[in-house]
Amino acid sequence: MSFFLFASLTSLIAQQKQQYLIKAGKLFDSETKEFKTGMAILITGNIIDTVKAEKDVTASERKNYTLLDLSKFTVMPGLIDCHTHLLCKETLYPDNKVTGLEMSRSLVFDGDAYRALYGAARAKAYLEAGITAVQDLGNSGQFADVALNRAILEGLLPGPRMRCSGPGLSSYGGQMPGTIFKHQELIKDEYRIVKNPLDAADAVRENVTQGATVIKIFANNTPNPTMLTVDEMKAIVDEAHRYGVRVTAHATSDKAAYNAVVAGVDGIEHGYQLADSTLDLMVKKGVVLVPTDGDSVSLSQYLKLSGESINPSMMKNYMSALKDRIQRAHKKGVIIAAGSDDYIDFKQPFAEPSKRALISYYESGIPIPAILQFATYNAAKQLRWNRRIGTIKKGFFADIIAVDNSIETNINALLHVRFVMKDGKVITNKLEL
């Protein structure tokens, strides 16, 4: 009797799953970078049943699935930001010449509890803006990022899917230059200081035990001059890979990036200065580049809030350097995944700086279809979630957004996402605006 009761309940639950039929104006295929017309997406619960021509949808399907008419919009996978700091905020103000001062202030005056609440607000905003998955890379105290992810998974608050690193593994000093010797212990609240290869492997075990699903290392400690050694990074990579966990490296100089790639990391974050030889090695070893560039609007706002004059020549040189690096990487075939490094308070709506990283790629001459692939298909590969998200296809999670049809020629359409679905649940619906 209990078996039949269980079977009946299972059948009833299956029947109660919400079913949606999405009619897309255009559908962005993140694998091929093509915009397709006349397509429909059928969803049951949180899983995509099928993607097919709208004309092939059966009468039974039209009857049983709730229609979501997105025929005036472009439908695409939810955006993925591979480099976030949801629990970190740096406030800009004139005459602040002490790099790292805001991090010290955050540790002393904010603490993990406030930062977790701040992160919760940002996580909600990210999701509502169409960013359905993130990789959060440290600067979150002692595993407050893991706690935030737990709350999202338990349904306590809305937010994107999260990969979490916990404290980044760093050489002496972390990213807090000027901290006097007496107060070096403060740095350990934000970074895991690595002392040698054996300690480096132990640090990996600590983070994995606490719930980290990616390991963030600092190949160099910009703005501090200290660096991890190749042997220390190799020890980290070997230990992380034993547990099936990826390692991605903060590396702002070519030397730091090259050393990290030699050590076997899976990703390079920032990579502002990359020689062709380093890019070639990245292609050979399949290392992903996450360029955390800002667009011209963000750069202008940064200078304004910092009390600096806007120098057109300086801005042009800065943007040209970023353009050169990403263009060379793209032409060589380096796998590029989108990431923002969004932690500065630009006095913009939460999540807008993340979108502006994508706009920066456009300003550097990358075609829009490639940019959308960076933020979906490639980003999912970088997070090792490419069998469940990043593409709209059968069996994948229903993480779907819709933007204006102008997206093919207007990258700014990403700033105004009109529809968001995560896990088969409608989060944002602004179709009538």
Predicted regions and their residues:
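Histidine/acidic-residue-rich, glycine-tolerant segments that coordinate divalent metal ions
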Residues: 138-142, 146, 153-259
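Divalent metal-dependent hydrolysis catalytic cores, especially in the metallo-beta-lactamase
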Residues: 108, 112, 119-145, 159-167, ...
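Active-site core of metal-dependent hydrolases
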Residues: 172, 217-323, 337, 342-347, ...
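Active-site gating loops and adjacent loop-to-helix segments of metal-dependent hydrolytic enzymes
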Residues: 88-114, 172-188, 285-319, 333-336, ...
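Metal-associated gating/positioning segment near the N- to mid-region
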Residues: 73-150, 154-156, 260-263
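Histidine-rich, glycine-flanked metal-binding segment
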Residues: 18, 32-76
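Bacterial Sec-dependent N-terminal signal peptides
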Residues: 1-18
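His/Asp/Glu-enriched, well-ordered alpha-helical/loop segment
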Residues: 242, 320-406
